[in-house]
Amino acid sequence: MSWATIRADEYCESVRDGTHDTPKQTETGYKLVTGKHIKNGQIDPSEAYCISEKDYKKINERSLVEQWDVLMSMIGTVGEVAVVKDHPNYAIKNVALFKCAGSELKGKWLAYYLQSSDAQGHMSGNQKGSSQQFLSLKQLRSLPVPVADEAYMQKVVDVLSVYDDLIENNQKQIKLLEEAAQRLYKEWFVDLRFPGHETTPIVDGVPEGWKKYKFSEITSIMSGGTPKTEVKEYYEGDIPFYTPKDSDGSFFTFDTITHISEDGLAHCNSQYFPEGTVIITARGTVGKTTILAVPMAMNQSCYALKCDELNSPYYLFFSLNKEVDALKTMANGGVFNTIIVKTFDSINLTVPTQEVLSVFDAVVSSIMEQIKTKMRQKTHLAEARDRLLPKLMSGEIEV
């Protein structure tokens, strides 16, 4: 097999980046995608803010994103990569744009290479900036890209795409299960159509026997901390260390980007929070919630929540999500950029009877366990793909 290495700007039609300006946020319009909306090979514009049509068109005069282009985060968290599989209608800011001339093969090959350990290592070793790491446009254009004959490249892409298709199908099943769990919570505790609701009187706005609290009255609210980053040994362990960068919207978190040692844990203000702890991000990406699937530590930009009156974390998790959505609505287009301990004084937690809670936990636990199983399967598929990827792309394993 004959291989060559060429520059990214030779491989691509062009290599560009998104706007460096900060267009004004609008209530409706077009999404402005940044690096934080690219994660695990997917582009998720749902959390991006909207900009006007005028700003959208202005950005796209030089940075139009089209099908089979490749996007990559280039500032802050560098190297999150995704190929554009659909016909997008968003603009980009501070994101690398590799134009692939509408070629599915070129787009997928490049995306797979940029996700490989070779490419990630190259980019990691060439980042600039002290407080915030970045890759310059000049560096992006000069990235080395290995190429082979088109037939071989297609075979490699086809093999890796099988894994991606399985991962994508798995993610769709997870989403359906998440929606089922959310519907169950809404039906029982928002619409109040819980078992036995027909014969349960409403007293002071809630079903008889239910109790109303402020979150802070009934929930333990615990903060985290960060070991000194200059002490290398603190970050040479296997304890997952949760930060807002790990908040991808998943119901459960199994692992984190950063890990710390037991010595690092002993030298920071974080506890070692047990499995089942509910986490909410307080700064950065604010209001993202998750449930720890394994014990973890966390930094000071999050809160850990625990309620001893509840049988499991699931009712607390869904109730917290509902209240965070309400807080975002109350912001009414304003900036919802931080949660402090006093925030929990202003949000409510209604606790049903133990009988209703026990039945809910029994039903929803079955759904949540299926979600965890599917998430583990997705992780194993991704790990298998990632082990295979460099061997296929280097020619170590031929297809």
Predicted feature residues:
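Short coil/turn segments at secondary-structure boundaries
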Residues: 21-28, 47, 125-127, 197-199, ...
